[in-house]
Amino acid sequence: MANMSRLNELVSEFGLVERRLGDPQALADGREYARLTRRHRELLPLVTLVREREQAEADLSGARELLQDPDMRDPDMKELAQLEVGGLQARLAEIEAELEVLLLPTDPDDGKDVILELRAGAGGAEAGLFVMDLLRMYERYAAGLNLKLNVLDAAESDLGGASKVVAEVTGDFAFRALKWERGVHRVQRVPATESQGRIHTSTATVAVLPEAEPGEVNLDLSEVRIDVFRSQGAGGQGVNTTDSAVRAVYRAGTPDEIMVICQDGRSQIKNREKALQVLTARLAERERAAREAQERQERASQVGSGDRSEKIRTYNYPQNRVTDHRLEGEDKNHPLDAVMAGGLAPVVSALARAQREEQLLAMSQEGAEDQHGAA
């Protein structure tokens, strides 16, 4: 049965969030209002289910009273009441299962905007072309979810590929939509430059960095070197005539060095702001990775799917098939043409479902162990 105390806490939080959303001070603070709106959307499905359960329990109680009423002798009415009891009991069991899923641990980063980094791996020019194919796939996927993808920097090649692309993805639950993409992506196809029709295998890596919360990372600007230069990318007249592009280098010349380039727009100020935003996200990711490494060491086990060293997905062009190696059975393979057109939703849904099933299994095992220990 769902944890009642936890449910009550979340319902109370929902009420508090609704009251805060009506507070003029919250409306005046754009960041706080966005946070409250996001939390309201997160809690609404759970609160809706809790209210439905309360109504179903009240209806069930009324139907049972009707069945037990000695003055009720109409057999048709009694049969209807029995059917209602059965239907309500079945629905309450469904609600209970749905609430258990909604109470599973959630990723606190799910509602955040994202820095998306694509890098060519093994395969030379073909890997760079694959990077651009992935970028177009993510652009279409994002558009379908009403997310905005904006390229901040791209190291493009003459053949139409890119060794690196850095983009910002903003909108509701951007991280939740893209977090499953972290890792090594492999492509198998005949490159455009291949004259003998041989299939080549190339790779690209994808990093998905959630935006850093204010105060999450203490970025000391005295440790950041800012360089400005003329943009090297496309953008029409004026792009290359002013020093609008910005390079931010954290702890230059040290093992901790991080370099970020932003040449998205013509405004040096905006490019500087975006570069520091990406730099902060990378620092936050580095700190998270360090914490995870420490946790892995302490429990002497590997953190599964999502490790960047894993090949998470293979794109097989000759067979028009995308295989996600984290999935099993019917969920494992998907039509390549649909996926490359932005149809990632079935893959993402399957991954989220598999994670929920693993969490539910872990919870049931913990519960069984607790009962065994109590016995």
Swiss-Prot record:
Keyword Repressor among UniProt keywords: no
Gene3D superfamilies named in the record: 3.30.160.20, 3.30.70.1660, 6.10.140.1950
InterPro entries in UniProt: PCRF, Pep_chain_release_fac_I, Pep_chain_release_fac_I_sf, Prokaryotic/Mito_RF, RF-1
GO MF annotation terms: translation release factor activity, codon specific
Region (Disordered): 289-326
SUPFAM superfamilies: Release factor (SSF75620)
Protein name: Peptide chain release factor 1
Organism in which the protein naturally occurs: Deinococcus radiodurans (strain ATCC 13939 / DSM 20539 / JCM 16871 / CCUG 27074 / LMG 4051 / NBRC 15346 / NCIMB 9279 / VKM B-1422 / R1)
Gene name of the encoded protein: prfA
